[in-house]
């Protein structure tokens, strides 16, 4: 399945619009991981812990998006938008949502 942020796919023609699809992922962060990440951030290093969690959440959201598109008989998802939000008590949770339009292309 083709998943793209663009509204069209070069070399393909959209023959049917199946509807809007979305996928979400909410991950909680471990207290010790957070403490370590904050220390790394304070000394100017990149937080590999947060980067891994962010990538994992993004992968989950896109996988759910693809599954929902397949359920509708789509062969692609266009116009994909990824949104990120830190939430929860003490900002201890990360939410990633992906949405787009499921389509059939030829």
Swiss-Prot record:
Q: Which domain of life is it from?
A: Bacteria
- What Pfam families does the entry give? YbjQ_1
Disulfide bond entries: none
InterPro entries registered for this protein in UniProt? UPF0145_dom_sf, UPF0145_YbjQ-like
Signal sequence span is: none
Q: Which NCBIfam families match?
A: PRK02877.1
Q: Give the similarity note.
A: Belongs to the UPF0145 family.
This one is known as UPF0145 protein GSU2791
**Gene source species:** Geobacter sulfurreducens (strain ATCC 51573 / DSM 12127 / PCA)
């Amino acid at each position: 399945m083709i998943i793209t942020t663009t509204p069209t796919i070069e070399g393909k023609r959209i023959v049917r619009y199946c509807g809007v699809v979305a996928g979400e992922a909410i991950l909680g962060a471990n207290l010790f991981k957070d403490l370590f990440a904050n220390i790394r951030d304070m000394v100017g290093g990149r937080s590999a812990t947060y980067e891994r969690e962010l990538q994992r959440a993004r992968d989950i959201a896109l996988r759910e998006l693809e599954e929902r598109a397949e359920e509708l008989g789509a062969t692609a998802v266009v116009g994909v938008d990824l949104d990120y939000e830190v939430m929860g008590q003490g900002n201890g949770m990360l939410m990633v949502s992906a949405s787009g339009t499921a389509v059939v292309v030829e």
